[in-house]
């Protein structure tokens, strides 16, 4: 994997609060190698290590994108939902930003069936066929469509398992992480000071609560994906 320059600087990360961890009572001892200090009862993440792992993650997604790889971004915190959707759409990635439905990946055949149903209902709505049904039947199908849009809208074009998952909160998205471990799908994970870095294939030590921190990390990864996709077009 070729190393590239991704304009990752420590000052920018400090301004975004990437270095702020959780209180010292709420920590995972396995995070010790990534913790720089304890300030007023708060663990401070070592940003030099964050920068190194983030650069590695950018290299990884660039290479995968240049080969046509598919990415799934997972971040279901309410305050991050819009950010996740915008970033994923920009980089032509799939995303889950509401609730992770158990078995979404490990029971892919069921997910695929739901996606087919979702596409059929969207087609019926676009062609006006839903409005020609009896009101009761139309109302039931519209509710189904709304439900599917909420939970599967970000993966509606996904035709198979993704090549890499980008997980923005290890604790919040633990079910998704376990499914990836079961299936052997590589994961890039933001890990705060209360997380287990050993569960992620490529952990990025960072504040996973502050929107500025999440935005900075996600924007770097999305930029690398976009660059990788452009590279594949320039060098087919």
Swiss-Prot record:
It is found in: Plastid, Chloroplast. Its main location: plastid. GO terms for molecular function: structural constituent of ribosome. Keywords: Chloroplast, Plastid, Ribonucleoprotein, Ribosomal protein. Coiled coil: none annotated. PANTHER family: 30S RIBOSOMAL PROTEIN S2 PROKARYOTIC AND ORGANELLAR, SMALL RIBOSOMAL SUBUNIT PROTEIN US2M. NCBIfam families: rpsB_bact. This is Small ribosomal subunit protein uS2c. It comes from Oenothera biennis (German evening primrose). The gene is rps2.
